[in-house]
């Protein structure tokens, strides 16, 4: 007989998530992350992203249950907790590779971060951002004027990217979305779909008069002068989903939401 998986239950600070964790720990035990087989994250998408950033290097599959305001990356939480082991056994994996971001700031400092949804550059003041865009070392947009620009993964393409009129990308398509944010010039440019291995470089053309910040998921860095982005070849995380509502189907269905 196969032993049940050891589950590490993580919860957001929200009261419903904390209460659910207490019940689940009482039912299934409390296993430390380093000796667990599966991570169960209780909260919303923000907490899921936090979990991936903090524990993605552990290579433990993550099964999320929605106990927050937004739950695109989560499964539904069910009051019948006894069916959790069956759900985990039937769950389908979705493999995500984050974006790797490297930043140079106006002060000369360097920084880096990962993003599972998107990396977005935004103007810091009332002045529009002036940016250049290089792809694989070739300048494609010499000067983009607008509120900013972003690079989104397929998993993140239904979030901020879609709100900025970017394309929804199928999971497993090995593509990225390059999407301008409120572009003024060139006005007709609406972005591009890139191969996942494309090296993207943004340069801020007037960082003193028109300062720009960059955010990788929730990690913000201000006063940047250059940002390089590419998909990670080293890091991959596994999310688990109920087969009747897997991530691939959710992304596909978003294209027909009205």
From Swiss-Prot:
| Cofactors that this protein relies on | a divalent metal cation
**What PANTHER family does its record include?**
NAD KINASE (PTHR20275:SF0)
SUPFAM superfamilies referenced in this protein's UniProt entry, alphabetically: NAD kinase/diacylglycerol kinase-like
Catalytic reaction(s) noted = NAD(+) + ATP = ADP + NADP(+) + H(+)
Report the record's Gene Ontology biological process terms: NAD metabolic process; NADP biosynthetic process
Q: What is this protein called?
A: NAD kinase
Superkingdom of the source species = Bacteria
Top enzyme class, one word, equals transferase
Task: Report disulfide bridges, numbered on this chain.
Answer: none
**Function summary:** Involved in the regulation of the intracellular balance of NAD and NADP, and is a key enzyme in the biosynthesis of NADP. Catalyzes specifically the phosphorylation on 2'-hydroxyl of the adenosine moiety of NAD to yield NADP.
One matching Pfam family: NAD_kinase_C
Protein family per UniProt: Belongs to the NAD kinase family.
Question: What organism is the protein native to?
Answer: Xanthomonas oryzae pv. oryzae (strain MAFF 311018)
